């Protein structure tokens, strides 16, 4: 649902899993985990999902943890890769600027500055949840913890339905070591990665890690001078300093930087074949993997190419001080910022009907203090406070060729050329012919019951703009204060009870500014005129036919508003208007856990999650009108979960499971109205399901795992009653193994895996035609085709290591059977009857070389 916000302001348990953990404490050699004689990493697992160190079996909710070694074994470089192996976790990545991250069917990927996330992403406890800045490379990672269910009590804002915490590898002071890695593959894929850990002294350690990767696009560009689509170009670096002046005080300073400059996203129309915009010759077919003829409109954003330019950086300071044997003080201080600009061909055709740009700027500061109590007695607890300050700005710009947009509205992109299929856009010279445009204007007017006179039709046709530009700027400033606490009471050696509470206060300001950038829209004014009563309709139509009407300033002599197409301007063509809101709310949890032995845990937990009130801003309904501010009620969810975690056969067999039920009130969603997407309260919703995983490590040579998740997520009221949540497959499954054997002087290993997900819809309306008819949409959507049926992907790696893994070579393949699938459908063009589809990744393969020292 990429940049759907571009039109959003327009006026026109049986028990199942929490996935067995694969985490471990700091490795004993460079990047290698400690193992026992069976190859089992779980002997040393430590997680901090409950803000204190525990074994995963002790955590009373569904928790998935993966070690850095697991990420390496399965070549997991980003969240989309990770999601395929994690039950109940889904990631749709159109570009690093537009991920949709979902836990148990709940997601949000809106780019509005004022939107609040439902799933929170953390780096070492620092929230990085704004979608435009959340997608980061996973490299030199100690572990990733995925906590499912409402985690507002533990993690605070944004963790309505879960949290993902990336624990980055920290410097070690006991050794100096490093790693270098290189990969190359098809599609001209190259990756370079390195890590260096320096033990400067027994109390000071330094660590630097970085990754750079590049790959050609996966969808061919059919127009000269335009790069193939969906390419990869990412560079990321991290530097960290650890100081331990004593065993009671640890200080970490971490700096992160990432830059992404991929080519444009392949928003491909399946209604219109790609054609040469000059000759009209058909260049390829309608398949999502077929080539695309996309290009930005002339002069848009200073002539920038399609693609993304994104920078993300941050500085984090961590302090852990043992004040006494019972009290430990933790501090997390962080500053983070990101800036993005993405240029998009929204319409998905070879004609520059609509070109879009989204620019996002964000900066945030956060401070958390937490005091933990643990005197080895029956009670453990913590209390804390946090402050969060964020400033965000989203700029959405669009450029229309009004002549081509008119042809689409009139269902005449084929130019009415005799014998030319409706699927083949005509040459630009045909569609820009004033005579044809005049006829199309009369046809559109006729559909409104209005007889457009020939002279007025000719005059308006002559005034249609090839490059009408307008923009929306929405800003949000947030100050939030949190107080929180949690306590666990061990009633007996086998039974413990716990509860937590968090209070949050938000102080928000939302502002909006809309403007037309090069005069009024003639097409927008014409469509607006058709909805007016007489005599105003004819008066406005006649004025729009005056030569040069697009650029004549409004005056007493020419009282024609500055019309936009999607963004009607605020006062004085761009005044910034703001509104304020203050919000308070509580979240809580309560749980019980029974542990008959150290390797078995049964638990039940109830939790309340809360997404803060949203103060949304829509542009005026008419030029120079008042912006439309809407306060959307806080969304709440009540979660009930029971689960079991156990290790059998001397910790060789792990079985985990969870059953859950969620009940939502004031579910926030986006609803399409014409060319407008508005934030609405969809009312009630619910989901229930289960997750289950098994892991078996019979020997040092063989490790197997499998997991399955079922999630039934549905709306329960309003026009969406009965619809599935978007990006919420009912069934997901993954399985894999690692087989290794000593061969000659080294060790050979083979790691195949298969992942499966069932059918998903890409919008909450499930692309149901009855929900997409005028006036809800500008043009009717007659087909339910914006979904992806179930599919499976197979990957494999074959490697050989020498000298205990110091030197390693491997070959790999992803999507081994070249399965065709789509990762998104609909998108911004859907609002104008131009849905687009984005192809998933094809088969890729290559070789990797690694050296450790």
Q: Can you say where each PLM-predicted feature lies in the sequence?
A:
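Gram-negative outer-membrane beta-barrel transporters
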Residues: 382, 386, 493-497, 652-664, ...
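Periplasmic-side early beta-strands and strand-to-turn transitions of outer-membrane beta-barrels
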Residues: 174-175, 181-183, 190, 195-289, ...
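N-terminal Sec signal peptide and the immediately downstream disordered periplasmic leader
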Residues: 1-74, 80-85, 247-248, 315, ...
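Acidic, small-polar-rich N-terminal luminal/periplasmic segments of exported/outer-membrane proteins
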Residues: 38-173, 642
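Solvent-exposed loop segments that connect transmembrane elements
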Residues: 218-230, 265-301, 346-355, 397-471, ...
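C-terminal beta-signal and adjacent terminal beta-strands/loops
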Residues: 43, 392, 398-405, 755-773, ...
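Membrane-embedded beta-barrel scaffold of Gram-negative outer-membrane proteins
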Residues: 318-322, 328-344, 595-619, 631-688, ...
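Outer-membrane beta-barrel translocator/receptor signature
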Residues: 116-118, 130, 139-148, 153-223, ...
């Amino acid at each position: 649902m990429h940049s759907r916000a571009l039109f959003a302001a327009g006026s026109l348990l049986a028990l199942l899993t929490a996935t067995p953990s694969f985490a471990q404490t700091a490795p004993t050699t460079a990047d290698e985990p400690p193992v026992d004689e069976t190859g089992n990493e779980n002997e040393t697992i430590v997680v901090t999902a409950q803000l204190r160190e525990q074994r995963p079996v002790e955590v009373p909710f569904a928790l998935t943890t993966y070690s850095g070694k697991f990420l390496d074994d399965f070549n997991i470089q980003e969240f989309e890769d990770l999601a395929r192996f994690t039950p109940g976790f889904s990631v749709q990545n159109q570009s690093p600027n537009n991920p949709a991250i979902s836990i148990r069917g709940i997601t949000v990927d809106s780019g509005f500055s004022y939107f609040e996330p439902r799933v929170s992403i953390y780096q070492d406890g620092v929230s990085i949840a704004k979608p435009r800045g959340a997608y980061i490379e996973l490299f030199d990672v100690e572990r990733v913890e995925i906590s499912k269910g409402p985690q507002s009590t533990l993690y605070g804002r944004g963790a309505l339905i879960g949290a993902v915490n990336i624990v980055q590898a920290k410097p070690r002071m006991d050794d100096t070591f490093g790693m270098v890695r290189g990969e190359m593959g098809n599609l001209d894929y190259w990756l370079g990665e390195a890590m260096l850990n320096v033990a400067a002294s027994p109390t000071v350690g330094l660590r630097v890690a970085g990754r750079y990767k590049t790959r050609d696009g996966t969808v061919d560009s059919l127009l000269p001078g335009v790069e193939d689509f969906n390419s990869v170009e990412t560079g990321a670096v991290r530097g960290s300093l650890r100081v331990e002046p004593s065993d009671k005080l640890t200080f970490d300073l971490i700096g992160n930087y990432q830059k992404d400059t991929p080519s444009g996203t392949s928003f491909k129309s399946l209604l219109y074949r790609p054609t040469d915009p000059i000759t009209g010759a058909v260049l390829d077919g309608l398949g999502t993997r077929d080539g695309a003829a996309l290009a930005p409109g002339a002069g848009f954003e200073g002539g920038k190419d399609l693609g993304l330019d994104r920078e993300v950086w941050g500085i984090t300071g961590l302090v852990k001080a043992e004040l006494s044997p019972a009290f430990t003080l933790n501090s997390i201080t962080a500053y983070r910022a990101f800036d993005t600009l993405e240029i998009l061909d929204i319409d998905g055709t070879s004609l520059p009907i609509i070109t879009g740009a989204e620019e996002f700027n964000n900066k945030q500061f956060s401070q958390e203090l937490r005091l933990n109590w643990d005197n080895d007695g029956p009670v453990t607890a913590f209390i804390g406070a946090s402050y969060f300050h964020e400033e965000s700005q989203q700029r959405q710009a669009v450029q229309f060729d009004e002549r081509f947009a008119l042809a689409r509205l009139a269902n005449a992109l084929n130019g009415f050329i005799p014998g030319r299929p409706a699927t083949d856009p005509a040459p630009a010279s045909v569609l820009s012919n004033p005579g044809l445009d005049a006829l199309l204007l009369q046809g559109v007017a006729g559909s409104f019951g209005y007889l457009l006179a020939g002279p007025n039709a000719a005059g308006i046709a002559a005034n249609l703009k090839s490059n009408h530009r307008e923009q929306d700027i929405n800003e949000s400033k947030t100050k939030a204060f949190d107080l929180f606490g949690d306590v666990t009471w061990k009633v007996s050696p086998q039974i413990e009870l716990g509860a937590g509470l968090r209070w949050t206060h938000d102080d928000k300001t939302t502002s909006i500014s809309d403007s037309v950038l090069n005069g009024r829209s003639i097409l927008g004014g014409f469509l607006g005129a058709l909805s007016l009563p007489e005599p105003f309709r004819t008066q406005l139509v006649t004025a729009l036919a005056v030569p040069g009407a697009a650029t004549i300033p409004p005056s007493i002599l020419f009282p024609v508003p500055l019309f936009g197409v999607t963004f009607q301007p605020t006062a004085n063509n761009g005044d910034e208007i703001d509104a304020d809101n203050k919000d308070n709310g509580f979240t809580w949890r309560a749980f019980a856990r029974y542990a008959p032995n150290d390797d078995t845990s049964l638990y039940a937990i109830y939790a309340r999650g809360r997404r803060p009130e949203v103060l949304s801003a829509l542009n005026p309904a008419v030029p120079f009108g008042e912006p439309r501010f809407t306060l959307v009620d806080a969304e709440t969810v009540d979660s009930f979960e029971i689960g079991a975690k156990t290790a059998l056969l001397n910790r060789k067999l792990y079985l985990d499971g969870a059953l859950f039920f969620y009940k939502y009130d004031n579910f926030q969603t986006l609803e399409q109205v014409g060319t407008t997407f508005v934030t609405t309260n969809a009312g009630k919703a619910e989901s229930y399901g289960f997750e289950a995983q098994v892991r078996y490590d019979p020997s040092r040579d063989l490790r197997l795992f499998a997991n399955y998740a079922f999630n039934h997520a549905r709306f329960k009221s309003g026009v969406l009653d009965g619809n599935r949540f978007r990006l919420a497959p009912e069934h997901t499954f993954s399985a894999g193994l690692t087989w290794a054997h000593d061969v000659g002087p080294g060790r050979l290993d083979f790691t195949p895996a298969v992942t499966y997900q069932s059918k998903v819809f890409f919008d909450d309306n499930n692309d149901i035609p009855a929900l997409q008819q005028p006036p809800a949409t500008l043009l009717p959507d007659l087909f339910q085709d914006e979904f992806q049926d179930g599919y499976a992907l197979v990957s494999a790696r074959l490697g050989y290591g020498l000298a205990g893994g110091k030197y390693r070579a491997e070959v790999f393949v992803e999507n081994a059977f070249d399965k065709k699938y789509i990762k998104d459908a609909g998108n911004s063009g859907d609002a104008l009857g131009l849905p687009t589809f984005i192809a998933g990744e094809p088969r890729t393969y290559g070789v990797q070389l690694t050296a450790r020292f």
